[in-house]
């Protein structure tokens, strides 16, 4: 297979070849073993920034001739694959920032490398994922929609068994958060590899984000963490890329090890999320949520700095707005009791 030979030689693919690569992965007449070899070969090579844009566009265009758009919409997500076994930080963050009247369209999946992905947590909460068609109406009603990648992109469902066969993260850990079905204005995305920071930031800009931050969490997490300096690449549609670091002390939070953020099963993570949103949990788990929510509020232009965003995120939890947002979603309901 010519394409596989090119991948084995670590040669970059152009847009046409990337389209062919995606077509091979979804073809019914090709075995999972061959697909796994293709995916492994692609994931072993160092992807270029252009290739990342190409594959993202290939995936989007395989499903949508024109992406749907909802004004000022945002997604907060990580690539996964960091093997930290943390609780569902970005899903918890989504409730907080949606309570600030930011239309949140979170594009998630079942976990591949941990015990609970965002879709697993939603099932435990009794919250249904939305369809692309129903999302605008849901945003108008409750300001937050969760989309399952395996529903919005059939390729994600078809390659799920292949990804399960593989021991290491694949390119789809990276592209999954990038290819939100909606053409977003804002995005915060976490990665577990520093080599991907600038490439992903530029790709998000290529895909039309007005403002976005890509963050590498201290000590290898795919969220901003409390254990040290977090590396950030920030892109704006009309400005040059900025890169800098931010640590908990910079935004008024205490240091804590990444081990303090460990979660568990979907039901255990539900309890963690509930305790944060109701104000019961005042531990490092709450702090990491307000840290990441603060970054998101800054990206969505609700505040002028990450530190102000952290203060606002704390207020949204402490005044009961965050748990009220959760209760709007139609799952189990709780009161603020902090």
UniProtKB/Swiss-Prot annotation:
Anthranilate 2 binds at residue 163. Its EC number is 2.4.2.18. Its cofactor is Mg(2+). 5-phospho-alpha-D-ribose 1-diphosphate binds at residues 78, 81-82, 86, 88-91, 106-114, 118. This is Anthranilate phosphoribosyltransferase. The lineage of its organism: Bacteria, Bacillati, Bacillota, Bacilli, Bacillales. Mg(2+) 1 binds at residues 90, 223. Binds 2 magnesium ions per monomer. The gene is trpD. InterPro entries: Anthranilate_Pribosyl_Tfrase (IPR005940), Glycosyl_Trfase_fam3 (IPR000312), Nuc_phospho_transferase (IPR035902). GO terms for cellular component: cytosol. Mg(2+) 2 binds at residues 222-223.
């Amino acid at each position: 297979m010519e394409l596989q030979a090119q991948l084995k030689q670590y040669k970059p693919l152009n847009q046409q070849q990337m389209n062919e690569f995606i077509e091979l992965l979804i073809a019914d007449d090709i075995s999972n073993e061959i697909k796994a070899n293709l995916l492994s070969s692609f994931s072993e090579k160092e992807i270029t920034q252009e290739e990342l844009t190409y594959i993202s566009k290939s995936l989007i265009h395989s499903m949508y001739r024109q992406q749907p758009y909802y004004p000022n919409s945002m997604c907060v997500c990580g690539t996964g694959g960091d093997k930290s076994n943390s609780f569902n930080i970005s899903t918890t963050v989504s409730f907080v920032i949606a309570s600030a009247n930011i239309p949140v369209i979170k594009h998630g999946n079942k976990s591949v490398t941990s015990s609970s992905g965002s879709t697993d947590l939603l099932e435990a909460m009794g919250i249904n994922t939305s369809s692309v068609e129903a999302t605008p109406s849901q945003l108008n009603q409750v300001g937050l929609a969760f989309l399952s990648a395996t529903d919005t992109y059939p390729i994600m469902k078809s390659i799920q068994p292949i990804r399960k066969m593989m021991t290491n993260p694949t390119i789809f850990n990276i592209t999954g958060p990038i290819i939100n079905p909606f053409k977003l204005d804002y995005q915060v995305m976490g990665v577990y590899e520093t080599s991907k920071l600038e490439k992903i930031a530029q790709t998000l800009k290529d895909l039309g984000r007005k403002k976005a931050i890509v963050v590498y969490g201290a000590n290898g997490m795919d969220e901003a963490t409390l254990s040290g300096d977090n590396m950030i690449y920030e892109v704006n549609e009309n400005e040059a890329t900025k890169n800098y670091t931010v640590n908990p002390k910079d935004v008024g939070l205490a240091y804590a090890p990444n081990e303090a953020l460990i979660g568990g099963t979907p039901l255990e993570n539900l309890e963690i999320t509930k305790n944060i949103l109701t104000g019961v949990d005042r531990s490092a788990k709450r702090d990491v949520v307000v840290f990441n929510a603060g970054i998101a509020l800054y990206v969505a232009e609700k505040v002028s700095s990450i530190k102000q965003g952290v203060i606002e995120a704390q207020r949204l939890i402490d005044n009961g707005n965050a748990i009220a947002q959760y209760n709007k979603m139609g799952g189990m309901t709780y009161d603020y009791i902090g």
